[in-house]
Amino acid sequence: MSPDPQNADPKPLPQLLKQMTPGEVAETLARDPRLILPVGTIEKTHPGLPMGASTIVVDHVADALSAEFGVLRAPTVEYGVNAVSEPEYPASVTLRKKTLHRMLNDLVTTWECHGINEFVLLTAHGYDPHLEAISTVGTVRARVRVVDLFAVNLSDLTGVRRSEDDRGGVYASLLLYLTPSLVHAEASDSGASAEQGRALYERIRARVSERIFLAPVPSE
């Protein structure tokens, strides 16, 4: 007999910092003093995709991980470090590497003072200066873990050696699965598909879960 949907256990929700009261935040951190901080970008990834494609992807992964593990999830930093935009793609915007680095340092320093002992910084943008700005964030004692979602091996799913070699196609498939209403026809015509997007998303989520949230914490 199939379970009654009305009696099924409710699906866990992400622990969204901006929607929680101070008491709820304190209770969450007392149970698990970690914080997920997604870092996005506003840039052209494909002519048929929204400018915030990388942010949309990292938002979905952050929400899923927060819900699965009950870890506090900070509001997304929407801007990152991008290459200089081509003129035909207006509104691409970039922070300087130093600016992003300083902003993240200020954020984690403040949160560390409130008892957070591990930061999980997620991004879906593999531009080297962007990753350098994130990976050099420092703390006094808290652990900082930086995750480039596209560093996960996806070659067997995409047919290319590195995700960055077909970044537009990877984003297109992911968004066809996650937010199909935001994908224009020209992105679908590139060979991207929701089926591939689901496989990519599940691979990324599983690998991050295994390596960051399920792996034993190394002894100091």
Which residue stretches match the model-derived regions?
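Extended, histidine- and acidic-residue-enriched regions that form the cofactor-binding/catalytic faces
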Residues: 2-220
